[in-house]
């Protein structure tokens, strides 16, 4: 399980250090793709396979499902850790997530999210404001 928040710098070649706790759970190879809210989603291979099966089961005749699956998979790339525990983020993913120098890696249960520091700060402020009302809504779902 992934949890916590870590700030790291992306070097000039587009490499990002993955925190040691995340490296252990991700393994040597994993998948990074375009996430929601302009962050990147990073999945261990076993989690990716489960998600892939669910997405393949969506009806491709529905425009929303087709668009989501297309966008999600078009950004997906297999990543591998180097000897220093870094990953090379492709330019298209860095551009999508507006990553230039400072990145925040966030553990979100079954995945890691990679955010630009500025977008994460903005998102966190908004999420903090909505946190209490979201908790109240989740009570209705039995959580």
UniProtKB/Swiss-Prot annotation:
One of its GO terms (cellular component) is nucleoid. Residues 5-47, 76-119 form the SpoVT-AbrB domain. GO terms for molecular function: DNA-binding transcription factor activity; transcription cis-regulatory region binding. It is found in: Cytoplasm, Nucleoid. This is Transcriptional regulator MraZ. Keywords: Cytoplasm, DNA-binding, Repeat, Transcription, Transcription regulation. Transmembrane segments: none annotated. Pfam families: MraZ (PF02381). Forms oligomers. Signal peptide: none annotated. Coiled coil: none annotated. It comes from the Bacteria. Belongs to the MraZ family. GO terms for biological process: negative regulation of DNA-templated transcription initiation.
């Amino acid at each position: 399980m992934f949890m916590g928040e870590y700030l790291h710098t992306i070097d000039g070649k587009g490499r990002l250090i993955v925190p040691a706790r995340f490296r252990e759970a991700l393994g040597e190879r994993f998948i990074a793709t375009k996430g929601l809210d302009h962050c990147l989603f990073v999945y261990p291979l076993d989690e990716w396979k489960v998600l892939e099966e669910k997405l393949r089961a969506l009806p491709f005749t529905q425009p929303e499902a087709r668009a989501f699956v297309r966008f999600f998979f078009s950004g997906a790339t297999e990543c591998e850790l180097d000897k220093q525990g870094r990953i090379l983020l492709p330019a298209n993913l860095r551009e999508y997530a507006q990553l230039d120098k400072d990145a925040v890696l966030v553990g979100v249960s079954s995945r890691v999210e990679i955010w630009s520091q500025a977008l994460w700060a903005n998102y966190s402020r908004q999420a903090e404001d909505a946190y209490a009302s979201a908790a109240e809504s989740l009570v209705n779902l039995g959580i």
